[in-house]
């Protein structure tokens, strides 16, 4: 299965009336396309990772599916101030997102993911600031980032 075939299927599904960016949730409603996306994004990481990590919220949809495909655990990276722990129990990192807003990601210090091999997954990357923040957060737990997996489509061609 070629990734270009999957990209062409995605292009055929994405609504043409989006403003600014595409709503990738639309492609997740197509089971066969969603399954193909998960398989393509998982291919290079079989037996190479201990966990898949993804930022809240849409990244979790793709990340959990890829974790299941790879037979590994999932790390849900939370948006700031969402974890039910005292501040001293949380590791966080701050970043400026694609729209210029200050944001943060968090994970519990008691997380069992220290010193593990991790694949980071998200639905799309615009500026890379969100991915960089997830990398920084996991590196605070001494994790090895094995790779990044995301849906890559040139918006100009859709």
Where do the PLM segments sit?
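Active-site-facing substrate-recognition patch
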Residues: 1-49
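Short glycine-rich phosphate-binding loop at a beta-alpha junction
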Residues: 49-56
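Short Gly/Thr/Asp-enriched flexible loops that form oxyanion-binding sites at enzyme active sites
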Residues: 61-70, 135
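PRPP/pyrophosphate-binding module of the type I phosphoribosyltransferase fold
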Residues: 99-158
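Short, ordered loop/turn segments at secondary-structure junctions
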Residues: 57, 79-81, 153-154
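Short, glycine/charge-rich flexible loops or terminal/linker lids adjacent to PRPP-binding catalytic cores
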Residues: 72-118
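Gly/Ser/Thr-rich loops at beta-strand to alpha-helix junctions
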Residues: 56-61, 127
């Amino acid at each position: 299965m070629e990734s270009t075939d999957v990209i062409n299927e995605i292009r055929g599904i994405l609504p043409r009336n989006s403003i600014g960016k595409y709503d990738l949730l639309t492609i997740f409603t197509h089971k066969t396309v969603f399954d193909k996306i998960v398989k393509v994004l998982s291919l290079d990481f079989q037996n190479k990772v201990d966990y898949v990590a993804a930022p809240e919220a849409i990244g979790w949809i793709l990340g959990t599916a890829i974790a299941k495909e790879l037979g590994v655990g999932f790390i849900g990276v939370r948006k700031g101030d969402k974890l039910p722990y005292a501040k001293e129990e949380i590791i966080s990192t701050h970043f400026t997102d694609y729209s210029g807003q200050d944001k943060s990601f968090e994970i519990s210090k008691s997380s069992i993911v220290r010193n593990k091999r991790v694949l980071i997954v998200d639905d799309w990357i615009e500026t890379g600031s969100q991915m960089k923040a997830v990398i920084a957060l996991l590196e605070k737990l001494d994790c090895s980032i094995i790779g990044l997996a995301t849906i890559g489509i040139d918006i100009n061609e859709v």
